[in-house]
Amino acid sequence: MKIKIAKRFKKDVERDRRSGQYSQLDFEILKHIITTLQEEKPVDPIYKKHPLLGTSKRYEAIHIKSDWILIFKVEKPFLILAMIGSHPQVYKKMK
């Protein structure tokens, strides 16, 4: 699949890099998960991949860490990276 990166996702990644809250390893795990999704392979269950509900039901979430969540959707042939952040950051923006 081809990847589309939302402007919000780019801003979120930059914010999280600057925060110092996430390690280089965390970003490597994120990259690995994105590659796995792009290749349409199953994501390891430890990352708790699940669909969102309600008005966000077209999106899915993956927990990179317990409180660092990737929000994305698949619209073939695209994998759309929508946003990333903590629960409050992500779900506040989804409303």
Feature roles, as predicted:
Residues M1-S66, E75-I80, P88-K95:
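Basic, Lys/Arg-enriched alpha-helical interface segments
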